[in-house]
Amino acid sequence: IVGGSTTTIASYPEITALLYFNRQACGGTILNNRSVLTAAHCPFGDAASSWSFRVGSTNANSGGTVHSLSTFIIHPSYNRWTLDNDIAIMRTASNINFINNAVRPGSIAGANYNLADNQVVWAAGWGTTSPGGSLARFPGVNARHVQIWTVNQATCRTRYASIGHTVTDNMLCSGWLDVGGRDQCQGDSGGPLYHNGVVVGVVSRYTAWIQSNA
């Protein structure tokens, strides 16, 4: 998370730190006691055994409970080139135990959820805290969050097209339009985007365009 501030798991008990060979790599949202929602590009092409996730901890590297995976399900229409339908569900090998103010399932927006332009949304995760920085150099060990805003779809599509990226109707754009300095970054992929406490999006991609445009 770039441009945000530290937070605690008590504020976001639905979020999970996804670990690739025991190192924080992506984020996720608890769906129920056996499933976690994330971005398809996180585990795509990997063995389930190479991933695990930590719940119930503000720190990505310690505390809470670590669960291994039994399998993961990539959205059948996921496109690795355009990142359309960039969502996946991870199945745990053991039940997730819900704990008040630390571990609970997220509230997921339904198909008819109405989200207008310029609405306040919040992103949370353990990604790098420096634009262009790597997780190794700028790890987000403690959970962070940032307030951003939804961006008009047509505006988003036009601006991304100028740098050769496709924005489909399945995508939601958010950021700080024409100001920048706040957003999700490397390592936040798969984590939630909240609108009034409801998960309305899964972090899919971050580009340098955000620094000057979003």
From Swiss-Prot:
Nucleotide-binding listed as a keyword: no
Tissue localization of expression: Hemolymph and saliva of the larval form (caterpillar).
Class in the EC hierarchy, top level: hydrolase
Location, primary (coarse class): secreted
Alphabetically ordered keywords of this record: Disulfide bond, Fibrinolytic toxin, Hemostasis impairing toxin, Hydrolase, Protease, Secreted, Serine protease, Toxin
Regulation: Sensitive to serine proteinase inhibitors and thiol proteinase inhibitors.
GO molecular function: serine-type endopeptidase activity; toxin activity
Documented EC number(s): 3.4.21.-
Compartments, as annotated in UniProt: Secreted, Extracellular space
Pfam families assigned: Trypsin (PF00089)
Transmembrane segments: none
Disulfide cysteine pairs (residue numbers): C26-C42, C156-C173
Described purpose of this protein according to its UniProt entry: Fibrinolytic activity; shows preferential cleavage of Arg-Gly bonds in all three fibrinogen chains. Contact with the caterpillars causes severe bleeding, due the anticoagulant effect of the protein.
Name of the featured protein: Achelase-2
Species, as recorded: Lonomia achelous
